[in-house]
């Protein structure tokens, strides 16, 4: 563990929102457990990502933490209590956005949010402001049954924010969205973190996880096989090489690679910098996708 990671871990002590220890769960009549001995913590104000292919156990873990599934082994506490030990006040403090839309199709987007707001005892957000934030203001009074798939994906995200939750559970929050609307959702998530909210995110989209998450856990067959910040995971498995793209003597684009160790004293590297027009210089980092495949031997499908 690096000095930075130790500092982060130390700062997380006393501010844990989620603690999972030895968590196991088997669905009735299933041959194998869906979750096998998971262990992790999530600190206040952290964006934590659970990453893995379909069927890895991500959504099951999330449902256990939300309280939708019971009878698990091990420990899964939120604010120092198992979800089953909480009363209705637990759901006043959390927000949930599932991957599959579940709205009232014969109500408008605005009416859906108004209805869900009525279920909370505390103050709630303005539905129109939430719809505007996710790009649905112009369709606020359109029946949800007439919404496109992308619109139906954005509505549950808006709904999850209606009670201004301290802890947000997001399942594939940008799945099925075009780049513009995916950017809106990501920006909201970043803003929520800046406001001290805690976000538990499950996805198989490595680019989204890399961009948003403070730490990620790779999950395969119900087990966590790696857990760290995206940057640390990539650095640990990156090639220590630098690629330079430059204009050759004839004006064509040429490429050269140099080892990072001893780069400051590499005469060939300095020759390229002195004698050619350099277009790009990049270190050869592994992508989070590359790391996942190397660690797990699996593709994200």
From Swiss-Prot:
Its EC top class is translocase
Listed InterPro entries: AAA+_ATPase, ABC_transporter-like_ATP-bd, ABC_transporter_ATP-binding, P-loop_NTPase
- How does this chain assemble? The complex is composed of 2 ATP-binding proteins (Rv2688c) and 2 transmembrane proteins (Rv2686c and Rv2687c).
Record-linked SUPFAM superfamilies: P-loop containing nucleoside triphosphate hydrolases
Quick one: a GO cellular component term?
plasma membrane
Task: Give the family from UniProt.
Answer: Belongs to the ABC transporter superfamily.
Compartments in which it is found:
Cell membrane
Q: What is its main location?
A: membrane
- One Pfam family in the UniProt entry: ABC_tran
Task: Tell me the membrane topology, using the record's own terms.
Answer: Peripheral membrane protein
**What keyword terms does UniProt attach to this protein?**
Antibiotic resistance, ATP-binding, Cell membrane, Membrane, Nucleotide-binding, Translocase, Transport
Q: Which residues form the ABC transporter domain?
A: 18-246
Q: How is its activity regulated?
A: Inhibited by reserpine and verapamil.
Q: What is its EC number?
A: 7.6.2.-
What role does it play?
A: Part of the ABC transporter complex Rv2686c/Rv2687c/Rv2688c involved in fluoroquinolones export. Confers resistance to ciprofloxacin and, to a lesser extent, norfloxacin, moxifloxacin and sparfloxacin. Probably responsible for energy coupling to the transport system.
State what protein this is by name.
Answer: Fluoroquinolones export ATP-binding protein Rv2688c
Among the GO biological process terms of this entry, one is:
xenobiotic detoxification by transmembrane export across the plasma membrane
Q: Which GO terms describe its molecular function?
A: ATP binding; ATP hydrolysis activity; efflux transmembrane transporter activity; transmembrane transporter activity
Listed binding positions for ATP are 52-59
Starting at the broadest rank, the lineage of the source organism is:
Bacteria, Bacillati, Actinomycetota, Actinomycetes, Mycobacteriales
